[in-house]
Amino acid sequence: MSSQDLSGKIALVTGASRGIGAAIADTLAQAGSTVIGTATGDSGAAAIGERLAQWNGQGRALNAAEADGIENLIADIEKEFGKLDILVNNAGITRDNLLMRMKEEEWDEIMQVNLKSVFRASKAVLRGMMKQRSGRIINITSVVGAMGNAGQANYAAAKAGL
């Protein structure tokens, strides 16, 4: 990645506890951005906070499936730091099961976290980004969205939706 100065920029990275999300959060923080990374629970959020503390970043708990959760989180971030400049929609879960055995709840949970949370988060930051005439929304998908795997119809559908 090129070394771009992101000093003064505010970034939210959902699903920042490990993997791609952690790497993105760390990279944005190292480039000077104030990064808020999310995890599903308090212990994960604390670990993100410890990791990002050297760059003045924070970890926050977020249940991406909850309708009010993402809107409330973004409102809190904007009160504390100002309007977001960067949103990385990375939160994602799997509930693998063959479609013929899949419960509707397994389908719905994946859609809520992996797809609908992207809509909610993006909608919540758009007004501020448009008002400041700048901002970036980055949606992390998967190759599984283009070419599914057995037992992942729900995950493939959500990632293809991005």
Listing of model-derived features with the role each one plays in the protein:
Residues 62-72, 104:
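The beta1-alpha1 cofactor-binding region of Rossmann-like NAD(H)/NADP(H)-dependent oxidoreductases
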Residues 122, 158:
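Active-site helix of classical SDR
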Residues 98-99, 106-111, 137:
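Substrate-binding pocket helix/loop in short-chain dehydrogenase/reductase
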Residues 142:
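Residue(s) in the substrate-gating loop at a strand-loop-helix junction
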Residues 100, 147-153:
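Active-site loop immediately N-terminal to the catalytic Tyr-X3-Lys motif
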Residues 31-47:
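Conserved glycine-rich Rossmann-like NAD(P)H-binding loop of the short-chain dehydrogenase/reductase
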Residues 10, 17-18:
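Conserved glycine-rich cofactor-binding loop
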